[in-house]
Amino acid sequence: MADYLLEIGLEEIPAHLVTESENQLIERIKNFFSDNLLDYKKIQTFSTPRRLAVLVHDLSNYSQSKDEELRGPSLKVAKDESGNWSRAAEGFARSQGTSPAEFDERDGYVYLNKHIEGVSAEEILKKIGIEVVEKMKFSTYMKWADFKLEYVRPIRWLVSLLDSKIVPFQILDVKADRFTRGHRFLSGGKISISEAGDYEETLNNAYVIVDAKVRKNSIRNQIRKIADTNDWNLHVDPDLLEEVNNIVEYPTAFAGVFDDKYLNLPEIVLTTSMRDNQRFFYVTNKQGKILPHFISVRNGDSNQIENVVKGNEKVLVARLEDAEFFFEEDQKHNIDFFMKKAERLVFHEKIGTMTEHMKRVEKIAALLANQLAFNDQEKKDLKRAANICKFDLTTAMVGEFAELQGTMAGIYAKIFGENQTVCQALSEQYLPTSSEGDLPKSKVGAMLALADKLDTLFSFFAAGIIPSGSNDPYGLRRAALGIVRIIGQQKWNFSVSKLLHSLKTAVDKHEDGFLIDFADTKEISRKVIEFFLDRIRQQSSDIRYDLLDASTGKVNEGIINYIFKRVRILASHVADPDFRDVIEALTRVQNLAEKNKSNVEIDPELFVTNSEKRLYQLTKDKDPIVLLSKGDHTVYQFLASLKEPINNYFDENMIMDKNPIIKNNRVAQINLLNNLISSLGDLRKVVVK
């Protein structure tokens, strides 16, 4: 047994790529050892902005031996007419280091049983550069010198040690050795690692805390200690903590101060300036009010920390001075001033201006508000919010702090005299901003956010701008997922197809300055609905694949909330004792209906058996949409109650009766029943055992 160390030394990696690169490295290492039949006890991973590393403990000295059977050429090819081994057979044997005499013959082929002895770990590890290091994939790449290899950042050194022995390999002009690098400023030159197991201690002595988890805990403890000492409430944003952890190798926390006059700025401006722009942690008093202090972390020790504090304070104050100036300047104008400027703001060159976008958002919001029974005041507030929703994009503050779009619209709207409902809706219009982000809390805000995202999708799809692969520069996947989540939260039921058709009627590209042509609404809605289905599958990744396929199989005009309900309904009943029997009865109907379509009206006078009459009485007045809208389980409970009547129906009746009139009536009844069952989707895709 031995310990093996691999370290990839790099120029500074962007903070957001460090953790995912570390995770990728350990997965590739595990796969490498699995493929090469090398056993080990455990693997430690390490990462800093300048390195990715693994330390493998108790690695076997040799890979496992194995026996394998290789299939060679067919007997027709392996032997000639006289039964002698052909050149093809001899070539196959030679390639495996044996002779045809070792062949087994069966099933028309020759086979070779081969015993493969284990290979030394050292020999296997020589391939780790090509099979692991070079195969790493990243979302961002760099090229350096005149090399063809692209990597997240240029490779500057490599360490490859099996206990104390160097395992050689080379990538470009960098040869693996035992020399690492310490902290860029606190440690000088190359540092020799005697043994693989000494890695962490060696780097600790060189001012590098190489274990990301240890480093993060150190940061957390240091900043909490400062906050506790000063009786501050500390707000530790986990994303900010992760980012700070990935830009330092030897963290030292410190506190800074700024003039309390800047506390007159909106709180979000202060926290954005500190958190997003400077990577500072803000603090509050016990009542939750922001204090004129911050906590930050330097990449180094406490030597001359006072200079670092002053420098960070100076940078923050400059940022806050700008914010204060922009805030005061913007208040010298009004919403109409900014709306006028928005007429020149391009939404997209193929789609039109931001003003045109706002007009379409207002149309969509109005259509949905009428359909979903908003009251008069809600409609009035929604119309006002939609009409001015993007005015803040032309303010000086958002021009400098782009991440505050929407938020500043709500703040400025309040200053300019808009009512609270409009202000809140404006501040919520971009929510959710991520797959797990907060949703709008107000009804009007949810509708504004929904309408904004719907127009974005409709417009880009109409212009032929549809995401492909991982490429999504306009965030359309995020918008679609936001739509799905808002609809699920609000339980709003509306048809995407009908909405788009109504929008086409309301929006004429030759009037009111609209640029988009929604001519082919059927094709646009088909693509948009399929796009939504992909997001629903993503949002429901915890649910069995077959239930997802079944739920998203048959879509009723793109009523997104109903699709969401289907997924959850099936998932909640899959463990029922009679689930299999229910699904089998219902899919029997769906299979027949798929093969036998009918537009014939059912004539109850043609019923022959009691089972026909009973099934008709149970289903004749049922509307699948009404069933779905009543509650999450109403539709399933109703369909499950039809299990016995359906089974009796098939036991007593021959659907394809010799009498064509009887047959057509029964086929029509099967199609009526299928229409109800399909409200849950294509249940033939459900896997029952």
UniProtKB/Swiss-Prot annotation:
Main localization (coarse): cytoplasm
Entries under SUPFAM superfamilies matching the protein: HD-domain/PDEase-like (SSF109604)
Question: Which biological process annotations from GO are given for this protein?
Answer: arginyl-tRNA aminoacylation; glycyl-tRNA aminoacylation
Origin superkingdom: Bacteria
Q: Does the keyword Thylakoid apply?
A: no
A GO molecular function annotation here is: arginine-tRNA ligase activity
Give the UniProt subcellular location, in the record's own words: Cytoplasm
By sequence similarity, the record places it as follows: Belongs to the class-II aminoacyl-tRNA synthetase family.
Can you state the subunit structure given in the record? Tetramer of two alpha and two beta subunits.
The record ties this protein, via HAMAP family, to:
Gly_tRNA_synth_beta
What is the recorded name of this protein?
Glycine--tRNA ligase beta subunit
- Give the species: Oenococcus oeni (strain ATCC BAA-331 / PSU-1)
